[in-house]
Swiss-Prot record:
Entry annotated with the keyword Translocase: yes
Protein name: ATP synthase subunit alpha
The entry's keywords: ATP synthesis, ATP-binding, CF(1), Hydrogen ion transport, Ion transport, Membrane, Nucleotide-binding, Thylakoid, Translocase, Transport
Matching InterPro entries: ATP_synth_asu-like_sf, ATP_synth_asu_C, ATP_synth_asu_C_sf, ATP_synth_F1_a_nt-bd_dom, ATP_synth_F1_asu, ATPase_a/bsu_AS, ATPase_F1/V1/A1_a/bsu_N, ATPase_F1/V1/A1_a/bsu_N_sf
Native organism: Synechococcus elongatus (strain ATCC 33912 / PCC 7942 / FACHB-805)
Family: Belongs to the ATPase alpha/beta chains family.
GO CC annotation: plasma membrane-derived thylakoid membrane; proton-transporting ATP synthase complex
GO molecular function terms listed in the Swiss-Prot or TrEMBL record: ADP binding; ATP binding; proton-transporting ATP synthase activity, rotational mechanism
Any one Pfam family match given in the protein's UniProt record, by short name: ATP-synt_ab
Chain's gene name: atpA
Amino acid sequence: MVSIRPDEISSIIRQQIEQYSQDVKVENVGTVLQVGDGIARIYGLQQVMSGELVEFEDGTTGIALNLEEDNVGAVLMGEGRNIQEGSTVKATGKIAQIPVGDALVGRVVSPLGAPLDGKGEIAATENRLIESPAPGIIARRSVHEPMQTGITAIDAMIPIGRGQRELIIGDRQTGKTAIAIDTILNQKGEDVICVYVAIGQKASSVANIIEVLRERGALDYTVVVAANASEPATLQYLAPYAGAAIAEYFMCKGKATLVIYDDLTKQAQAYRQMSLLLRRPPGREAYPGDVFYLHSRLLERAAKLSDALGGGSMTALPVIETQAGDVSAYIPTNVISITDGQIFLSSDLFNSGLRPAINVGISVSRVGSAAQTKAIKKIAGTLKLELAQFDELAAFAQFASDLDKATQNQLARGQRLRELLKQPQFSPLILAEQVAVVYAGVKGLIDEIPVNQVTAFVSELRSYLKTSKPEFIEKVQSSKQLDDAAEALLKEAIAEVKKNILAAV
């Protein structure tokens, strides 16, 4: 019989006690009371934060938005078809984040950073909060560098600067997305990171845009964030903030970035849907009371940072869709008041063949003139006024039978200026070409050319400058100024091209 050795037993027990670690995991859990329409009402979750991510039993994630006395209202980020009444919900202790890093460039991602392009996982370097505070007053500096769009009408009359918020507004099918995509294409070789956020669009439309960017080599410096029309309203609501977080990552590294939110009307509608389902009180047009804050906190994140913070910038081009040209509706007026100007696209101008269909009279850039290059500022000063006067005269001339010579000349000049500013899609002009085109129109050098030949004159002038006067392009592109030597070269080129056009007529 084995003898019991108490000292050995006590040493073993002591050893076990020393090795014991009290690993108690405290979880904040609740129970689903009700689920449906992308909303879950949860009982419990006493310690949950506003905007915190919660996890359901089936793996679906949600965001706690309504914190009430007896329940929590959460919006789902997935279908949530397997969530049942009485199932358990866990609070994660995290606020919505997106993985960011240089590897995002050239990729198509969801608002939560999941790859959508079938190219495998993205090697992110850090996580950023989807919602983060905008830079303060001291962190910013005024807008002073140009953000060239490649569209002559915009760069000459409604210039955009790096760090500006410029609204693109108009009815459906007036070319809003076309302007945004042209601006991305024009950033090639400019060391600008572009972020295109597609909100509530058809998957086929987004696929077409990605294909255009890929064909023209623009995907090499672009990130696409897509929340299609088939996605839950929560993801459509989060998509712009995710795009801003990605752009902020590059901005904080001292880079220039361009973000396009296409379009914020869909985001506001998604937010309205969520708010009404959460039983928040509706306001004007059934939007919740904080719909202004929805867009202001997003667009205020666009900035030109001070040199102490690296001098990076985020330029925002939000898109808003109007109904029958009504810019006095709730969402358009909100976003107009937040942004630094707007480019208004008119369906009447679009249908009359003027593309881009920019209504110069009510389009404005409030801070961009400080960033406009000297070359184009020097010659485009009177362009906007002349076109506005032409529109007024053209309306008046419909009723007047006999017009004096000066009025006839002004109408003829206006028609030619309007023709000059027509530009096909996906063909941005470099600065030197824009200077040449605007110079020819403003100085009256094409007044003898028939109106139907103006487009031919523009394309011939562009090719002539490239082949016969490359020194003009080189001078203007490098100095960003139109000096006397460059002006002399330009006059020669215009005279030569004009002679050829008139000879062929």
